[in-house]
């Protein structure tokens, strides 16, 4: 399976009063990696994440497991893999590490809906292409 690689330095604003990354912030960083992977396909993010398009892709499930804390200044390496789950949804798996040591694993599941009716819809062709690329 082909991975998309993303790097992100932890900023002070990512941390909590204990000086470690706030637990929910790692999911936000995973979403940054997802956005970067979509942008790397040449997809314009403003229209992709807007309800003015023909479809929307809400996250219907998210989970994260933490292996070790991360701190301000740490450089995270994030690998993500996307997998189709039928014709109208897909899963993104994330592996986060720092200095080649596992930090966390996460997963999001996205559902494709018609933006106006909110009914299930097949994944757009460009997204299907991305899923095929990551499956190879």
Curated annotation (Swiss-Prot):
Enzyme Commission identifier(s): 3.1.2.28
Q: In which pathway does it act?
A: Cofactor biosynthesis; phylloquinone biosynthesis; Quinol/quinone metabolism; 1,4-dihydroxy-2-naphthoate biosynthesis; 1,4-dihydroxy-2-naphthoate from chorismate: step 7/7
- Matching InterPro entries, A to Z? 4-hydroxybenzoyl-CoA_TE (IPR050563), DHNA_CoA_hydrolase (IPR022829), HotDog_dom_sf (IPR029069)
The keyword Signal appears for this protein: no
Q: Give the Pfam families listed for this entry.
A: 4HBT_2 (PF13279)
User: Which reaction is recorded as catalysed by this protein?
Assistant: 1,4-dihydroxy-2-naphthoyl-CoA + H2O = 1,4-dihydroxy-2-naphthoate + CoA + H(+)
According to its UniProt entry, the function of this protein is described as: Catalyzes the hydrolysis of 1,4-dihydroxy-2-naphthoyl-CoA (DHNA-CoA) to 1,4-dihydroxy-2-naphthoate (DHNA), a reaction involved in phylloquinone (vitamin K1) biosynthesis.
Matching HAMAP family, A to Z? DHNA_CoA_hydrolase
Member of which family?
Answer: Belongs to the 4-hydroxybenzoyl-CoA thioesterase family. DHNA-CoA hydrolase subfamily.
What is the protein's given name?
A: 1,4-dihydroxy-2-naphthoyl-CoA hydrolase
Q: Which organism is it from?
A: Synechococcus elongatus (strain ATCC 33912 / PCC 7942 / FACHB-805) (Anacystis nidulans R2)
């Amino acid at each position: 399976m082909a991975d998309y690689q993303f790097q992100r330095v932890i900023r002070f604003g990512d941390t909590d009063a204990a000086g470690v990354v706030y637990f929910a912030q790692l999911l936000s960083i995973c979403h940054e990696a997802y956005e970067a992977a979509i942008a790397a396909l040449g997809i314009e993010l403003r229209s992709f994440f807007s309800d003015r398009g023909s479809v929307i892709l809400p996250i219907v499930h998210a989970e994260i497991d933490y292996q070790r804390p991360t701190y301000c200044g740490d450089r995270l390496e994030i690998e993500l893999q996307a997998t189709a789950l039928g014709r109208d949804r897909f899963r993104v798996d994330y592996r986060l590490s720092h200095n080649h040591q596992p930090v966390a694993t996460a997963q999001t599941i996205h559902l494709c809906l018609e933006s106006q009716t909110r009914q299930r819809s097949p994944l757009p062709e460009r997204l299907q292409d991305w899923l095929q690329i990551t499956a190879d």
